[in-house]
Amino acid sequence: MFTGTYRVRVDDKGRLAIPAAFRKQLPEGSFVSLSLDRVLAIYPPELWTALADSLLSPLQGPDQREVARTLYSLSEAFEPDGQGRIILRPEQRRLAEIGSPASVVVIGSGSRVEIWQEARWDSYSADAQGRFTESADRVNSTR
């Protein structure tokens, strides 16, 4: 399970050093992709496979095809270099509004890792923390 928050830099070549705590848990063949809320997500292979399989069906509608095409075209398997860095493609960075160089926030999000543009994370996090109790109450009421 991925937990924690780390502030790191994306260098001028688009390289991001994955925090060591996450790197230890990510197996070979993990994927980086665009996710919801204009963030990038790192998925272990088994989670990526489950997500990709959920988009495959013989009778896809136009929305499902669009989501599948966008997701697949913006996703890439990676192997960190010797310093634990991965390269975020320019198109991935553009859609997540991450420059190079840039400060980003890498968070554990349970089964995956998310990469946020720093100012957007700071705003989102402050708002979400302020609503935590009422959001948790709503989640619990639907169980």
List each language-model region with its residue ranges.
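Flexible "stalk/tail and boundary" regions
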Residues: 1-7, 12, 22-83, 90-143
